Amino acid sequence: AITTEADAEKKGTEMGRKHIVPYGLYRAEGFVSANLARKTTGFSDEDLQLLWQAILNMFENDHSAARGKMAVRELIIFMHDSELGNAPSYKLFDAVTVARKDGIAVPRSYQDYTVTVADTLPEGVHCERKS
């Protein structure tokens, strides 16, 4: 890299390069405790709906050249019939799979992936998908 004027004189033909990843698909997992919400924080169903909206739109008003075009593509929510939960979170997270579609060697868009949720979930749990 050219870092000084002396370097510039010696390395006049050197150009910088940035390595890029043309497309990346990130997965994030999180939790909301209904029991803690009721007992401690006062977190309401209205707050929960606002949280879902905030997650879905979190990059819309925060564009950055460093992050490229980041966007939340889908929110997969597991709802439990019981306040304490009907299944451990790891089983629910394991029910979500992301795979490249056949014939796609180098993904370039979200459409190059298939995101699925297992058809059978533990009793007392249902899935809601938002995009």
Residue positions per predicted region:
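Basic polyanion-binding and macromolecular-assembly surfaces
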Residues: 1-131
